[in-house]
Regions:
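Glycine-rich beta->alpha junctions and the first turn(s) of the following alpha-helix
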Residues: 1-74, 139-140, 156, 165
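Generic, well-ordered alpha-helical scaffold segments in large soluble proteins
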Residues: 41, 45, 86, 114, ...
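C-terminal helix-coil-helix/basic helical segment that borders enzyme active sites and/or dimer interfaces
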Residues: 47, 51-54, 70-103, 116-124
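Alpha-helical scaffold segments that form or flank carboxylate-/histidine-based iron centers
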Residues: 58-69, 94-103, 131, 136
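Amphipathic alpha-helical coiled-coil segments
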Residues: 107-115
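Glycine-rich phosphate/cofactor-binding loops in nucleotide/flavin-utilizing enzymes
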Residues: 119-165
């Protein structure tokens, strides 16, 4: 690769890995924010929608799904706050960002699906913010290392053995 086409301050794969570590942390925060957004969109939808002459938010299963969504978002927030504390303390490693990215993206994916469910058919309409959150969840789940790759990074830290070939 000619010198003119090289990224500045990137001299080895270790430099690339450091960039990915930092980006995974950012993605974990993004996933957490979108997770709260999906929950809030669903909560707002059920607050103004009626079904069978009753507020949609009064149905037991809708309330259970809202509770599940808020729990997912809150757990994600705890994970990224801890990640930030690790960064600030200088004890931040690849597996920390991989774990946060993997966990928050999975919680987002689940929360977006639940939000879509409580909105029924309106949850798949493109003008509905729930549909946008659902699409964002799929993208976030995949970029800056797929769920599987990040799981292997975590597994390597747990076992001391790399599954990468």
């Amino acid at each position: 690769v000619p010198a003119s086409a090289r990224l500045q301050r990137i001299n080895s794969f270790a430099d690339v890995a450091a960039c990915l570590r930092n980006m995974r942390s950012d993605v974990a925060w993004i996933a957490t924010g979108v997770c709260f957004g999906a929950y809030e969109s669903a909560r707002d939808y059920v607050a103004k929608r009626s079904q069978f002459g009753k507020p949609l938010g009064s149905f037991q299963l809708v309330q259970e799904k809202l509770a599940h969504m808020l729990s997912n978002a809150t757990a994600s927030l705890a994970m990224v706050v801890r990640l930030t504390q690790q960064q600030e303390a200088g004890i931040y490693r690849d597996e920390n960002s991989a774990m946060a990215k993997t966990f928050t993206a999975r919680m987002l994916r689940e929360t977006a699906a639940l939000a879509r469910e409580v909105c029924g058919g309106n949850g798949i309409l493109l003008e509905n913010s729930v549909a946008r959150h659902h699409a964002d969840a799929e993208a976030i789940y995949s970029y800056e290392g797929t769920h599987e790759i990040n799981s292997l990074i975590i597994g390597r830290a747990i076992t001391g053995v790399s599954a990468f070939r």
